[in-house]
Amino acid sequence: MVPPTVEASLESPYTKSYFSPVPSALLEQNDSPIIMGIDEAGRGPVLGPMVYAVAYSTQKYQDETIIPNYEFDDSKKLTDPIRRMLFSKIYQDNEELTQIGYATTCITPLDISRGMSKFPPTRNYNLNEQAHDVTMALIDGVIKQNVKLSHVYVDTVGPPASYQKKLEQRFPGVKFTVAKKADSLYCMVSVASVVAKVTRDILVESLKRDPDEILGSGYPSDPKTVAWLKRNQTSLMGWPANMVRFSWQTCQTLLDDASKNSIPIKWEEQYMDSRKNAAQKTKQLQLQMVAKPVRRKRLRTLDNWYR
């Protein structure tokens, strides 16, 4: 069974979000505060989406059910089968982890690149800004489902103190803890980490044209990923925009290196400007060729008037 977080984003080149139904136990209870964890997967790779996930439950359910019985941790420390098994216990109707709600936003390579490549550069929508906005939209979406959040734990993007202040100002009344390595420190962040990682991994797999295709880890430092980029680079458009983040320096370098074998593209504005400049130069040259020398007027005086 494909996770609903994946189904919501399959085949779309644009950013999509998914919000699970709120577990009825969370809407009915008042005896334990509701806590949330937030984490991402895929911030650094040149391939595939960046996925943000939130997971929430009651403090009591976390302490009495999740922590004693399930091995949630930083998703990078878990094997792929373990991650998928843990997430399946949340989204499948198997009567296991029934009191965990979750939501995801998959920021596609197209939207990441578009945000980071605006002109002029002062208008760039950098990755931190995109991450902050998506995080706040996810929190807001859960609150709009009538979930009364008490405490939110966030794996940091940028300096923890300034980010925490930003979140507290946006959501007064909700307590925030923003920390580095939060996915190893707080259980609900670990749950969110697993949700984000599994969702991203399956989405990246879906991008393969051949099941045996080797993409590598997706990171620009991975020789297998760089080899895939070189192998699949086309002379006109580079790579599919739904797979590759063109704003990454790795892509810029490969495009520049291949410029001799690539098809040059001139935008209409550039073409019109070049024609206008050429016409102006031609006109100036013609004026220079046909211009007649200016005759100086003879100075008339009265020197010889009486002779």
Swiss-Prot record:
Catalysed reaction equations from the record: Endonucleolytic cleavage to 5'-phosphomonoester
Entry-linked Pfam families: RNase_HII
Enzyme Commission numbers on file: 3.1.26.4
Name of the protein this chain belongs to: Ribonuclease H2 subunit A
Keywords: Cytoplasm, Endonuclease, Hydrolase, Metal-binding, Nuclease, Nucleus
CDD domains: RNase_HII_eukaryota_like
Subcellular location: Cytoplasm; Nucleus
Gene coding for it: RNH201
Functional summary from the UniProt entry: Catalytic subunit of RNase HII, an endonuclease that specifically degrades the RNA of RNA:DNA hybrids. Participates in DNA replication, possibly by mediating the removal of lagging-strand Okazaki fragment RNA primers during DNA replication. Mediates the excision of single ribonucleotides from DNA:RNA duplexes.
Lineage: Eukaryota, Fungi, Dikarya, Ascomycota, Saccharomycotina
